Amino acid sequence: MVLKIRAKLLFFFHISKKKRTFANKLIRNTMSSTPAHYVYQEPAIEFVTVAVQLCLYLEQVAEHEKSDFIEKMLCLLPLLYLKARLLPKGTEEMDGYPERFVTEQEYEDVRQLIAQQLGSDDAYLEVFMEDMRYSDEPITAFISENIADIYQEVKDLACNYQTREETIMNDALVSCLEAFEQHWGQKLLNVLRPLHALSLTLIDE
């Protein structure tokens, strides 16, 4: 178990000397007989690891085929949802909100990359939206926009984790989980339906 966690941590911190020192600190906490801090516990590490994998893939999505993108999302997004569901709730340790790292331009870059990858398949009809309370008809939604919203939340978390400050990491994790419950968890589930349909269409072709 410890070796598995160590491998995940070294992947996350890219194995540089400075980051390896921090990763080793996390490992020592996981091996300690006393309860580890919230941010060092295995559920948190596993959630952040999947979040980082998703971010890295989305930032390089132009290098992949449409079919690969769809299959990757159908693997990573359910895994991210599962890891978020298994994450115990933490408690904020600071006043104020964690720092936001993703700029409007970075968000738009990711959204556009996904939209270009999907083309006309980006749009789909959605019934699980806040705006549906004002409409009797399904509303057009976009896979690219929903995934970009998810990206923004988990990328901010990953960047806050890389500060290596426990209180910052803690509050970023708490904030990300709250946002998961409030909006991006539902958005994640929403896009799985059209992505699943697209994957079957590609098989038929």
PLM regions with names:
Residues 33, 138-141, 149, 153-205:
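Acidic, proline/glycine-rich low-complexity IDRs
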